[in-house]
Every structure is written in C-alpha cells, then in structure tokens.
C-alpha cells in the first residue's frame, strides 16, 4: 500500500462515495451516511444473488416487510431507489423496518479505511464537487465504476480487497 492507495474491498468504498454524493445532492452528513450504507448493502445483496451467494426472499415475505415499514418513501441515489423514513433526526434509510443509524456507519467506515478515511473522503468530495448536482446524480455510479478497487470476477472476488487509488479519484475531478 502506498500513501495514495488503500487496500480495501468495494462495499465501504461505495458506502463512502454514496454518502459524499448524497451530501452534494443536499442531504446532511448523517442522512447521507444512512443512505450510503443502504445503497452499498443493496448493491452487495444483488451481487450476492447474481453469484448465488444469497437467495432471494419469497415474494410474500418481501410484501410483509414492506407493509411493516410504516410511512416510508423512496430516495433515488446512484441509480437505486432506497427505502427511507423521516425520523426525528432527519432522513434515514431503512433495512427491514429498522432505520440505519449514522454513528454505526461512521464506525464502519473508520474500521475499514483506518487512518486513510479523511484523505479518501477529501478525494471523493473533490470529485463530487467537480459536478453540478444534477449531473452528479446522473453520472455518480459510472464515476464509482471508474475508481472502485479492481477485484477478481465472480465468487472468488466476493469480499476481496483491491487498491483504491486516491490519485485516480483526483484525476477524474480534474478531467471533468
């Protein structure tokens, strides 16, 4: 690992990027953390299903879970619709009927990025700031695909770490 490269798997990278994009689109920091974690979770779940690691839940169970969520709405972030609720503290993405708390997401990011979290966050903020919100909303996932860690395809790559190159993220902002 060099100072500008971080060995990390894709889930925390997507979590952080989605949170940074959500802030740029107008959500506050805590709301963005909750939404970012939900997006990465849904992405991992769909990838896991495609690889045969997770099996989809029966339709009846999904319908019950949706009814039990109460007053929810959907937030579109990086091309995915995320279930959310308006809690006392602000917007929170939900998993099942449970809101995702931002403090837990911040601890997760700190544990995965370690001391490199501030620099990774800074690079991603610079990239997000290079775009107007509407353009970022449209291109955000494609940008992530350009800088995400490269890992082996298929089941062998599940959970594998790759290099997150902070210089590559910064170059995308300049090339914009």
Language model region names:
Residues 1-176:
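Solvent-exposed interaction surfaces and binding hotspots enriched for charged
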